[in-house]
Amino acid sequence: MSEKLKVGILGGTGMVGQRFISLLENHPWFEVTTIAASPRSAGKTYAEAVGDRWKMTTPMPEAVKNIVVMNVNEVEKVASEVDFVFSAVDMTKEEIKKIEEDYAKTETPVVSNNSAHRWTPDVPMVVPEINPEHMKVIDFQKKRLGTTRGFVAVKPNCSIQSYAPVLTAWKEFEPYEVVATTYQAISGAGKTFKDWPEMEGNIIPYIGGEEEKSEKEPLRIWGEIKDGVIEPANSPVITCQCIRVPVLNGHTAAVFVKLRKQPTKEQLIEKLVTFKGVPQELGLPSAPKQFIQYLEEDNRPQISLDVDYENGMGVSVGRIREDSVYDWKFVGLSHNTVRGAAGGAVLCAELLKAQGYIEKK
């Protein structure tokens, strides 16, 4: 591969922005050349702007320390420096929708970690192993925006990554009712225990907006493009409870499923461990070699042992067993800020590059 694509990170000083910067260090295709954040950070070096708020466990990459942070609101100026941007801005939903489209209108592709555009009908919301074909809706979005190369693409909520891939792998058995309870890490709120000491030894049985996202977003991912928009699927019915637990990284889900066709346990496991998608076929740089692993031990998956499976880009499943109320039950685990956030967005960008939607300006 020749010259790397120049990448900007919008909202680069926050937790997800930091995760983007960590993940993109030494990336074979992409190089972070521009970081944009709020006006109060603009004009400082990245190291000064972040100060003692670096939340990653690995050190800040040397290559970004002296990048001078730009004002994220100076759209034309930031856009002129990059081939595409990742968005992790912290604003209101309406502000995010506007600023992401403003960047797209400068002919700069936007790959967003935010939820603002997830239900914009012509914006693809993609898990690359599940619905890569949804990227085709970008052609309709460009007509609406009046662009030739600018668009917005998004990744779904972190909570669904522990069970949506499993249900996709079991599609031929026709899941029709799903009950899920998610146990979600504090990094999902952009926090560490240092920022949120009251979470130590505590559980909060509510995460604002999370249950609706967890119930509805999988249906959009399983939907189809019709008349230039994505029409969500109407089955299975999913009901969720989302609980904040005292864990730094990793979302666990306890899931019950009703299936129209009854497989054996061995068939269910076989479908998981052989499940592959376009990222695996293309060998994309961030793609896990095996997307879903099944663990036979009764006490797995565990955060401390399994959250970093496939560099945080894989899903770990365990405890598949028959159920007396539903048909089957299982426990899933995924890394909420890697696969569930920045890593998932990086994989989307790799897919978009492979599909020809992202290229050098």
Predicted regions and their residues:
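Charged docking surfaces used in two-component/phosphorelay signaling
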Residues: 187-361
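N-terminal Rossmann-like NAD(P) cofactor-binding subdomain of oxidoreductases
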Residues: 2-205, 237, 309, 316, ...
